[in-house]
Amino acid sequence: MAEHGFEAWWPYQKLAVHGFNMEVLRRFREIWTIRRDLGDRLLADRPDVFVGVDAPDFNLGLEARLKAEGIKTVHFVSPSIWAWRGGRIHKIHRSVDHMLCLFPFEPKLYHDHGIAATFVGHPLADIIPLQTSKQAVREKLALPRDYPVFGMLPGSRQGELAMMADFIIAGDNAKF
């Protein structure tokens, strides 16, 4: 976004944590301070709307604060309340004016709880094909037909990569 003229108030790496683990605990004070300071800054600037992108453990609290002060809030990437921690729907109701959903079944879950929601689709849906030819992939990667293929997708967060690095390296030499 910085390449497109947006100003970053904090480097995104400071918030690139996942879940609730030791990394988050070690950085809790810093993350909490960023969220508090961001809220203070937004309340002083009074934007027409705040759009929180994913990161519900960070954004929902911030959105609740902004919404309580009369700032419209939109959340992009619905938390997976249909899979786990469904009780978050109540916090979402207090925090979000409108939820933008990646999956077509999600808006109904929100509508049933009085929350405006719109299915917007997944950003990768038009990029990743629904069907692929295994043979074409094997040819492109020059893999023999009977060669086992294993995909490991560790994510992009530094903490996740560090946690899984030994496993990834060991997997490179694994025999299946």
What kind of feature is each model-predicted range?
Residues 139-176:
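Active-site donor-nucleotide binding/catalytic segment of nucleotide-sugar enzymes
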Residues 1-137, 153-161:
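Active-site and donor-binding regions of nucleotide-sugar-utilizing enzymes
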